[in-house]
Design a protein with these regions (language model features):
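Short, hydrophobic secondary-structure boundary micro-motifs
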Residues: 28, 63-64, 132, 171-175
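Conserved, well-structured interaction surfaces
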Residues: 45, 85-166, 182-183
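Bacterial Sec-dependent N-terminal signal peptides
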Residues: 1-30
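Membrane-proximal, proline-rich intrinsically disordered regions
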Residues: 21-71, 97-98
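Terminal processing/anchoring signals of secreted or surface-associated proteins
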Residues: 1, 21-23, 51, 119, ...
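Proline-centered turn/helix-capping motifs that create local helix->coil transitions or kinks
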Residues: 23, 163-171
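Active-site substrate-recognition loop segments, prototypically the cytochrome P450 B′-helix/B-C loop
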Residues: 75-79
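Short linear capping/connector segments at secondary-structure termini
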Residues: 30-33, 135-140, 173-181
Length: 184
């Protein structure tokens, strides 16, 4: 009987100790920002900065605003040079023999719709905190209207970049339809 009591006490202690560390395991990562972090004026300002950051791209040929690959090379102002095995996707742009899986076109498409996504995301977040943005202390202008106007400009700008390259038959993505039409 004494042995049965000891085994039962050990089993109860083992089961009780297994449930004690759940709070320790559910700690939020320090460097991670969640959606509530953006639902204020400072968060909206961070989203505006992120939207402007979509203008900069480290790649000279693909998603950049210079449109070197699509304007100069395809227009005949620049030649790719070298031989046909050097950057075959670039050669196909120069000779107008490209396919839908051309890496330069794919990256340009994705970078443009990434800019559209940032603008639409900013519009959705700004609408959630409209009352806070409308009356910003120390500012005479309406911060909400200015934010929405900047986001709509960027959305139009990125759509125009897509239309310049792919023609008028490209999907228009507004702030209600954020996640669709990201891939060509």
């Amino acid at each position: 009987m004494k042995r049965l009591f000891i085994y039962a006490a050990i089993a109860a202690a083992a089961i009780g100790s297994m449930t004690s560390c759940s709070d320790f395991l559910e700690v939020e990562p320090v460097g991670k920002m969640s959606e509530p972090d953006f639902l204020n004026q400072e968060g909206v300002s961070r989203l505006i900065t992120g939207m402007y950051a979509t203008l900069h791209n480290d790649s000279y040929f693909e998603g950049t605003l210079t449109n070197y690959a699509y304007g100069d090379v395809m227009g005949g102002s620049a030649n790719k040079g070298s031989n046909f095995t050097d950057q075959p996707d670039f050669t196909s742009l120069e000779t107008y023999t490209f396919a839908a899986d051309n890496s330069y076109l794919s990256v340009k498409w994705k970078s443009c719709y990434n800019g559209v996504f940032f603008a639409n995301n900013l519009i959705n977040v700004a609408k959630q905190v409209e009352t806070e943005l409308t009356a910003v202390p120390g500012q005479s202008k309406d911060y909400f209207t200015e934010t929405i106007a900047q986001a709509r400009f960027f959305r139009a700008f990125w759509h125009f970049e897509v239309v310049k390259l792919f023609g008028a038959a490209v999907p228009y993505v507004n702030d209600e339809d954020v996640a669709a039409n990201v891939n060509p």
